């Protein structure tokens, strides 16, 4: 079902009929930083997301990258795959101790890591200068999460790029 607007009665009816409906809300764009270029990556049939990600991270300019995933399990899986490909990465999420998260964040800030993988919970607490790219490995569940993720790049008047993977 596609509609430009839905009133509450329509939303109630939809929730009665559809199983696990997905709501896509498009905003005016005024909510995100104007210094951030936002791009979608449409995965074609047969493309493996982690392989596309690894290829992206080999490109020039992908120096300080934050990757966001929906769950702690996904964050750990992505980190494991990137490390197997000799990409300097680490992860932060709720199952890691505060000490571990701080060490990983400090290593990322110091340039010892190319990539930091995090859950949305971490998105609000990450304050790092010069993040070149943000990659949404999975589409965030809310507009608020998207805004906070994308807001990790393009700070202090600098430009940044945010990518979001889209699967068919």
Predicted features, each with a name:
Residues 1-168:
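Conserved helicase RecA-like core
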